[in-house]
């Protein structure tokens, strides 16, 4: 492969950065406008999933842990059977059992409740977990909050030595909720 031609073609179509590894060794690395931060929007969800993977590996949480055990102080007064059965795994697969995608971008400024964890757990769990996919921000958000609570730090601090440094990502920032918790469903820059 001609890396110079590939790099020129990538730049021509608006690629923001390029890193090529061969047999575990970086053989080409180029960024255009390195100082500019860009929101990766919902790709943030994948980074939050990495945080959960590290936390599982470190014994901080389990994918089979039920949400009622993970968030006991945040539960609504009435706990449905579906909420009772929902697990951390269901957060990551977006098969939580909630009928609608919640905590989406246009919705967030409209919420009067500042504690989005309590709000997210109060939305109806209309379906049995792991039976229906509904794209949402609730799952990745709650998964990120759980990692933050168990690790004792925000997601950027948790992921910097585990992921960001290894990828050469410097000074990442992340959107936060009204109470200052990282919004793991989006807003990673």
Model-derived features: positions:
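Flexible glycine/proline-enriched surface loops and loop-helix/loop-strand junctions
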Residues: 33, 124-128, 139-141, 177-184
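Amphipathic alpha-helical interface segments
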Residues: 107-129, 139
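Solvent-exposed loop and edge beta-strand segments that line ligand/cofactor-binding
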Residues: 36, 40, 79-82, 128-135, ...
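Active-site helix/loop module of the DD-peptidase/beta-lactamase fold
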Residues: 58-98, 122, 150-186
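Active-site SXXK
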Residues: 24, 39-64, 91, 143-147
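Acidic-glycine-rich active-site phosphate/pyrophosphate-binding loop
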Residues: 15-29, 112-120, 164-175
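A short, well-structured edge-of-sheet supersecondary motif
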Residues: 3-34, 63
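Short alpha-helical patches at coil-to-helix transitions and adjacent helical residues
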Residues: 43-49, 85, 135-140, 188
């Amino acid at each position: 492969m001609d890396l110079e031609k590939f790099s020129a073609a990538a730049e021509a179509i608006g690629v923001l950065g390029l890193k090529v590894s061969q047999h575990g060794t970086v053989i080409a690395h180029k960024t255009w406008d390195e100082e500019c931060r860009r929101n990766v929007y919902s790709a943030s969800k994948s980074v939050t999933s990495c945080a959960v993977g590290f936390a599982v590996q470190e014994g901080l949480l389990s994918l089979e842990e039920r949400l009622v055990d993970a968030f006991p102080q945040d539960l609504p007064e009435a706990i449905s059977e579906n909420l009772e059965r929902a697990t951390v795994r269901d957060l990551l697969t977006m098969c939580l059992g909630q009928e609608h995608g919640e905590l989406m971008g246009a919705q967030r400024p409209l919420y009067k409740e500042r504690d989005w964890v309590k709000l997210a757990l109060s939305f109806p769990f209309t379906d049995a977990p792991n039976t229906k996919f509904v794209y949402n921000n609730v799952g990745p958000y709650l998964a990120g909050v759980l990692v933050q609570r168990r690790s004792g730090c925000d997601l950027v601090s948790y992921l910097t030595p585990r992921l960001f440094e290894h990828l050469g990502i410097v000074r990442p920032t992340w959107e936060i909720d009204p109470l200052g918790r990282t919004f793991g469903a989006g807003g990673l820059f």
